[in-house]
């Protein structure tokens, strides 16, 4: 009799690239957002310094460790990329995803699961101001609804990523 020790089954890699651009929330909310988005299938996280963000010091290394631990916990075969915080203008200028969504408190449709890759832009506490929304529209981001309720940034991040990742 030959036995082989195996670990838990590995989940498949996300079907499409899903980029999360998240306005930096205050306190530990970004830590939670990174963890939940990783579990939901995000492939790339871009922390965004928005007008209403409470920007903290360089915590990208911490977020990378959190993402790596979350990926291991959910048996993901890979870790998402975690960028250094960037201004909204810089972050939007780097997006190459063919599908681009901005989560707004609207009656619009939910984001469909992505086939080719998508980016979702989530605001910080208090949301984006009108000029930031206009900038996102100018970069090809269409409004999308994540449901009828006002969500915390970290919850919106997880829901947006999960819907785009088809989970």
Residue ranges and their predicted role:
Residues 2-101:
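RNA substrate-binding interface of SAM-dependent RNA methyltransferases
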Residues 27, 31, 127-131, 151:
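Short, electropositive, low-hydrophobicity segments enriched in small/polar residues
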Residues 35, 60-62, 115-117, 134-137, ...:
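Short, glycine/charged-enriched secondary-structure capping and boundary segments
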Residues 95, 99-145:
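Active-site/ligand-binding-proximal alpha/beta "capping" segment
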